[in-house]
Amino acid sequence: MKKHAKKWLAMALSLSVACMMLPAVGFAAGNVASVDGTEYATVQQAVDNANGKTVVLLDNVTESITIAKGQTIKLDLGGYTLTNTAKQHTITNNGTLTIQGSGKVDNVDHGKGALVNNGEVTIAGGTLTRSQEKGTDAATSGGNSWYVVDNHGTITMTGGQIINTSGFSSLVRNIGATFNLKNGTLQNTFIVLKNDDNGVFNMTGGKVVTTGSQGSALQNWGKATISGGTLSATGGGVALQALEWDKKYQSVTEVKAGATVDGDVLVRQDPDYNTGEIEFTVTGGTINGNVTAGAGAEVALEGGSVSGALGTIADSGKLVVSGGSYAQSPAKYLAADAAAAGIGKQGGSATYYVGTPAQIEQRVEKAAAGDAVEVLQGDLNVTLPDGVAVINSGSGEVIVNDQPVTGEGVVTHTHKAVKVEAKDATETEAGNIAYWYCEGCGKYFADEALTKEITKDDTVVPAKGQAAQQPTATPGVNPQTGDNSNASVWAAMLSLAAIGAAGTACAAYRKRKAQ
C-alpha cells in the first residue's frame, strides 16, 4: 500500500513540474490589456508601450486613457467595455488612434465624453456611448449629460456606432474640426451631429438618426457635404437643419447624388442673431420631406427629388428651383430661365420636373396614352402619341404635334385617315367628292395632308335628278283671292286680250295709210 502511495505522489510531482514548464496560455490575474502578447495591469501602461502596435482589452475595465501626441496605436476592444475613471473623459486622443472590435467605450459622468479627439481617429468598430445619460429635454440635463464624442481634430468613421438617448446634449460636436462619415451609425434623441463653427462634415455613407420630436439628424453651422448615406428623423424632428449665428462662421450645405434625407429640411438664421445669407444647395439625392427656407436662407434646388412641400417662412427667405423632380408643384419658386411640367395619369397625381427646355421636352415626350401633361413654364415643342392630355398653364409657347396648346388644353391625336375616292352623281343617286376620313376622331379632310378639315355634308354631290324636279314658279304668284285660281281660265283671258290689242293696232295702221 505504501509502495502505491509513493508511486502516485511521484506522478503528481512530475505532472506539476511539467505544467510549470509549459508556456503560459492564460491571462495573469488582474491584467486588463495586452500588446503583442505582453500583458499589462492597466490600459494606460499598454498604450504607453504600444506605439505603432495594437492594444487588446482582456477584460472590462474602469479607466481613463490618453494617447500622446505623436503616438499611433490601435485599440481593439475585444468584446469588452472601457468605462471612464470618475470625472474624466474615457479616451483623450492627441495622437493617431484606431478603435476597432466589438466592445464599448462608455462614459458615466456629467460633462464628460467617451472620446475627446485632438488628433486623428478612425472608428472602425465598437460602440461609443454614455450609458448613464439623464438629459431628457433641452432644459433638463438631469445632472448627467454631455457629448459622447467631442471632436477638435479629424475623425473618419468606417464602422461601429455612436449612440445615446439624450434629449439635452448633442451626440457628436464637431467644432473647428473634420468628421468624415463613410459607414456606421450615429443615433440620438436630440441633435445627433452638431457641425459647429468652422466644422467640416463629409458624409458618403452610414446612417445618422434622430428619434426625438425636437431633434436634428444633422445640425450644420459650418460646411457640410452629403453625397451618400442617410439622414433620418423618425420621431417628428428635422432630418437636416442648416443655421448661422455669425457671418464670419458661414453655413454652407450641399446635398448631392447618392444622399438620402428621410425627413424635413429647414434652413434659417439663428433667431437670436442677424447674420448673412445661409447657402444651401441640392444638386442630387432624395429628400423625403418638406424643404423650408427661413430668414436669411438662400436655398437653390438644382436637382434631386423632393417628396414634400416647398415653402418660405420669412420675406428674407429665398427658394429657387431650377432642376429636379417634385411631388408637389414648384411653380411659385421656378427660376426665370427654367422649364417645368407635371406628368401623371389623367385624373391622378403628377410628378413635376424642372430643368432646361430641352430636358423637359425629353421628359414630356415619354408620356403615353392616358397620361396628362401640365406645362408650368417654358417654351416647348414636342411630339406625343395619341391620347395624351396637354394643358399650358404658363405663359410660354407650347407646340404639340405642330399645334399650339393654350390653357384650354388638348388631347393629342394622330390622324389615320383613309381616302374615299370621288363618285359621280346620277339622276337618282348622290355622289361624293374625293376626301379623307379618320375613323379615330370622325373628322373629314379635303386634302391628303389633312390640313383642310371639312364637314360630312361638304363631301356630298347631289343627285342630278334633284335639280330637274325643282319648281320653276316662285312663291306669291297666285292672286290673293282666298282660293287657288284656275290656270287655264287665266290663260284664255290673256289670249283674248292679246287678240283685241292686235285688232286695234291694225285698224289704226289702215287709217294712217288712208290719210
What is the predicted role of each segment?
Residues 62-74, 82-100, 107-121, 137, ...:
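Extracellular beta-strand-rich solenoid/capping regions of secreted or surface-exposed proteins
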Residues 49-62, 73-80, 363-381, 389-394:
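Glycine-rich repeat segments that build the extracellular carbohydrate-interaction surface of secreted
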Residues 55, 65, 73-75, 89, ...:
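Solenoid scaffold repeats with emphasis on beta-solenoid/beta-helix
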Residues 21-32, 477-490, 506-510:
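Sec-dependent signal peptide cleavage junction
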Residues 30-58, 346-374:
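Acidic Gly/Asp/Thr-rich repetitive segments characteristic of extracellular carbohydrate-active
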Residues 79-87, 100-111, 124-145, 157-169, ...:
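Beta-strand-rich solenoid/repeat architectures in extracellular/passenger domains
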Residues 410-411, 454-485:
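C-terminal low-complexity, Ser/Thr- and acidic/Pro-rich disordered "stalk" regions positioned immediately N-terminal
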Residues 499-515:
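C-terminal membrane-anchoring or membrane-association module
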